């Protein structure tokens, strides 16, 4: 279970480290990959679109921090479902206008992972409960 939660932590740590390359390493580059989010566009996204939007999101937030709260990990053979509450904080930066806005978001997430040689994310669903 520890290696599963580590994959989720690597995903969100990208917001702190800005090491965007790991996003492609921990997610399954396959037509089977999908993601949903509460950030437009709201449609079901494929691997390439998800990576591009994640990179844009993580580089647009400075002083990023997060907390995964009450994770529930269910393992089924070579797949796992991780459901959790999520607190994200940081400064949303507009580099063109040289402005920033503090953000604090309480949300929830569900990640589905599969294991071949290593655990990889095959589906992400993130949603806001409220902005603080």
Predicted regions and their residues:
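Short, aromatic-enriched amphipathic alpha-helices that serve as compact interaction elements
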Residues: 1-19
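Short, surface-exposed coil-to-beta transition loops
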Residues: 66-68, 83, 104-109
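A short, structured loop/turn motif at beta-sheet edges
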Residues: 73-82, 113-120
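A short hydrophobic beta-strand element
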Residues: 77-94
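Short beta-strand edge/turn micro-motifs at domain boundaries
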Residues: 103-132
């Amino acid at each position: 279970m520890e290696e599963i939660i580590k994959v989720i932590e690597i995903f969100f740590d990208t917001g702190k480290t800005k090491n965007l390359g790991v996003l492609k390493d921990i997610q399954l580059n396959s037509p089977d990959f999908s993601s949903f989010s509460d950030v437009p566009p709201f449609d079901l996204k494929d691997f390439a679109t998800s990576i591009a939007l994640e990179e844009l999101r993580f580089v647009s937030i400075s002083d990023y921090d997060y907390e995964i709260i009450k994770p529930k990990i269910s393992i089924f053979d070579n797949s796992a479902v991780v459901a959790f509450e999520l607190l994200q904080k940081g400064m949303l930066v507009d580099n063109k206008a040289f402005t920033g806005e503090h953000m604090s978001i309480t949300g929830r997430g569900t990640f589905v992972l599969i294991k071949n040689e290593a655990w990889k994310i095959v589906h992400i669903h993130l949603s806001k409960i409220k902005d603080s």
